[in-house]
């Protein structure tokens, strides 16, 4: 699992940097579900297509493929287990053109390792029906939060393989914020721009630390049951968040967020209430990272999946997060942010300027979600 956590964590931070190239934009995605979805495709890839995928997914370090898929099997079992005090639903499915004769061995492996189905649709003669079918499936899996994953025209009669990957998360804070303390404050989007946000406030004991080399505070907000944590990285007001992003590697992330190395102290926390809904067409992102062959007919080698000549037509990722006084819900809408109130000598953690946030699964160290809040 540790090897897999490192591979997934490395991929997560590479994605964060790629998706976050435009500094003014908010970012939110689930690297774990993207890794799962792509690893499933990787299972059917061969030759150079597989080599490129292993490279961007950081599977090279882990020595071979078989243990990767078993690793995902354990990870998904752990993350999707029932009886938790949070709700997390990860839905992966490959939709293939039915004339392509997908190998039963590949379908069986999808089910065994990834709890995922390979479903055959008629893209050639019923493209709109296929699109609606995929959207309905996603909506069901995400409690209706992600309703229109594939927009009209996003699949066509030439579509052969659509990889769909959706996540829904809802969790309450271990210690909730009192709604009466929430008030409108200004969020410093940049040196010369401020926007109003609804700022939540709580004074309590939390784990936190300060990383001197990047002038950044790190705060850990646990969810009920303490199986999941939100980790917030907030640079000092004089430090640009880009500096933090540039320095961030998986090794540093692990070192900086080690709970046993943090102080538990009373702190005044101001955190914006926000909602983010982000949708990414992952093809250009994955191509930029070096995964090119998979998308090109003639170059793509998915002979472990089907004997038909196949390429990946579409990789869509959509995710939602809502952070409020009760906790977090992956849900659709727009965002809001925060500022601080008068302090005694209690340290302040005042997220009234851009910050990074991560939702991590404690037991597996898996980064379930990554985000950047730049602007309400």
From Swiss-Prot:
Task: State the compartments where it is located.
Answer: Cytoplasm
Q: Where would one find the signal peptide in this protein?
A: none
Q: Which residues carry this modification: N-acetylmethionine?
A: 1
N6-acetyllysine modified-residue sites = 195
Which residues are tagged with the site Reactive bond? 341-342
Q: Which UniProt keywords apply?
A: Acetylation, Cytoplasm, Deafness, Non-syndromic deafness, Phosphoprotein, Protease inhibitor, Serine protease inhibitor
Which Pfam families does the annotation name? Serpin
Q: Per its UniProt record, which disorder involves this protein?
A: Deafness, autosomal recessive, 91: A form of non-syndromic deafness characterized by progressive and age-dependent sensorineural hearing loss. Vestibular function is normal.
Spell out the protein name for this chain. Serpin B6
Species in which this protein is naturally found: Homo sapiens (Human)
